[in-house]
């Protein structure tokens, strides 16, 4: 039973990631969010919350962070229309520093 639950959570996390990526591309009118990429989503076991990891290509992270936090209710309401869940998880946006570190390491290695 535990494996089925974790598989379901992983599947829903991936679905949330895909839907958020689509929402950022199609419905967000703020140009500062055009460089935001969703890298991963980790939903809690009870699906009450989800951590959304993102990176930024164009804008500064400090500019994008409060915008995403304010828009989390909008994203949650849009997700509720596409996800077939009783309760849509609350979204928390977290900057993904690991992907930036990886890009920096690749850049340094390419210089060698």
From Swiss-Prot:
Cellular component GO terms held in the UniProt record: cytosol
Main subcellular location: cytoplasm
PROSITE patterns reported for this sequence: RBFA (PS01319)
InterPro entries found in the cross-reference section: KH_dom-like_a/b, RbfA, RbfA_dom_sf, Ribosome-bd_factorA_CS
HAMAP family reported in the protein's UniProt record: RbfA
Oligomeric and partner information: Monomer. Binds 30S ribosomal subunits, but not 50S ribosomal subunits or 70S ribosomes.
Protein name stated in the entry: Ribosome-binding factor A
Natural source organism: Ruthia magnifica subsp. Calyptogena magnifica
């Amino acid at each position: 039973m535990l494996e089925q639950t974790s598989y379901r959570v992983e599947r829903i996390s991936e679905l949330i990631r895909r839907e958020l990526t689509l929402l950022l591309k199609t419905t967000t009118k703020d140009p500062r969010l055009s460089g935001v990429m969703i890298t991963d989503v980790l939903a809690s076991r009870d699906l009450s919350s989800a951590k959304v990891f993102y990176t930024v290509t164009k804008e500064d992270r400090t500019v994008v962070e409060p915008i995403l936090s304010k828009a989390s209710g909008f994203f949650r309401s849009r997700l509720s229309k596409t996800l077939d869940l009783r309760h849509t998880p609350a979204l928390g946006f977290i900057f993904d520093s690991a992907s930036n570190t990886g890009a920096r390491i690749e850049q340094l290695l390419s210089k060698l």
